[in-house]
Amino acid sequence: MTNIRKSHPLIKIVNESFIDLPAPSNISAWWNFGSLLGVCLILQILTGLFLAMHYTSDTATAFSSVTHICRDVNYGWIIRYMHANGASMFFICLFMHVGRGVYYGSYTFMETWNIGILLLFTVMATAFMGYVLPWGQMSFWGATVITNLLSAIPYIGTNLVEWIWGGFSVDKATLTRFFAFHFILPFIISALAAVHLLFLHETGSNNPSGISSDSDKIPFHPYYTIKDILGLLVMLMLLMTLVLFSPDLLGDPDNYTPANPLSTPPHIKPEWYFLFAYAILRSIPNKLGGVLALVLSIMVLAIVPLLHTSNQRGMMFRPLGQCLFWLLVADLLTLTWIGGQPVGHPFITIGQLASILYFSIILILMPIFGTIENQLLKW
């Protein structure tokens, strides 16, 4: 008799994805982030569900309902802060996951990579809408500024913005629809993640060497289940340290002031994980140009596979490529810092230089360095 794990139609899918899955024997801790993202998503859906039980999406009561969750609901404070800081952990894992993909050339799995980019956009949209829900000053003005960017689209821009707002300004209709979208999007993300995995399992995982590992595979369980649990414990420890010791570290103090359309905060800025894109947006003096640069800062990832010129897949044996990759990381950290600074000298210039460098590395320098390395290996 066949094992039920291998014969049952439903259990078989789980078995082939998480138990008997043939995995390369040499994948490092950088391959942990996929499973960590899955855990983050489940954590966000569960904490979000419990928050939604007590939250009211009405401009008059939204701020008070969040305060009520923190003060009066049993363990409401920990649920709220796990959800808020869980989003930060989600993005840390996302950036590490994408960085791993760029470093080790995982982007050559085109379908998996493109679904991943779509996932990144969807998660960013979800996080943005979630930030609007507490209806503090930064929520309101963040929503106003970011949705207003769409007005840069020629001809239909203004109508589009008012259609999204459900009126002539960010108001009750906007908050209600943002809550509805914020609730439904994580389930769409779950479906996309399943498709992401489906495409990944068509080809099998990449590995640090970038060479086919078909000749040396090991079962996912117990080897990588144990390895993933270690990563999970480290992540949960970091998350709970943040939640229990400094829950407001990554938040904005302005969001503890109820939304007031008549008073603009001195410095409008998004959450830390959007600051790099926000800095690129601000570095271009033209509104439409800024919006295009903002979208391109993520969409540029879709062009990365087309610009791969090296004969080697990953950067493990490519010192020039490695230098360029870490320069890109440093540049993104610089952009993140600039995005949180007020608009003024010298931050404007630094932001513009960092933005130029960001696009130059990906679109110009990486393909050139790949070709140079190919030539050097011939000598």
UniProtKB/Swiss-Prot annotation:
It is a multi-pass membrane protein. PANTHER family: CYTOCHROME B. GO terms for molecular function: metal ion binding; ubiquinol-cytochrome-c reductase activity. Component of the ubiquinol-cytochrome c reductase complex (complex III or cytochrome b-c1 complex) that is part of the mitochondrial respiratory chain. The b-c1 complex mediates electron transfer from ubiquinol to cytochrome c. Contributes to the generation of a proton gradient across the mitochondrial membrane that is then used for ATP synthesis. CDD domains: cytochrome_b_C, Cytochrome_b_N. Gene3D superfamilies: Cytochrome Bc1 Complex, Chain C. Heme b b562 binds at H83, H182. Heme 1 (or BL or b562) is low-potential and absorbs at about 562 nm, and heme 2 (or BH or b566) is high-potential and absorbs at about 566 nm. Belongs to the cytochrome b family. Heme b b566 binds at H97, H196. It comes from Ichneumia albicauda. Disulfide bonds: none annotated. A ubiquinone binds at H201. GO terms for cellular component: mitochondrial inner membrane; respiratory chain complex III. It is found in: Mitochondrion inner membrane. This is Cytochrome b. Binds 2 heme b groups non-covalently. The cytochrome bc1 complex contains 11 subunits: 3 respiratory subunits (MT-CYB, CYC1 and UQCRFS1), 2 core proteins (UQCRC1 and UQCRC2) and 6 low-molecular weight proteins (UQCRH/QCR6, UQCRB/QCR7, UQCRQ/QCR8, UQCR10/QCR9, UQCR11/QCR10 and a cleavage product of UQCRFS1). This cytochrome bc1 complex then forms a dimer. It comes from the Eukaryota. The chain crosses the membrane at residues 33-53, 77-98, 113-133, 178-198, 226-246, 288-308, 320-340, 347-367.
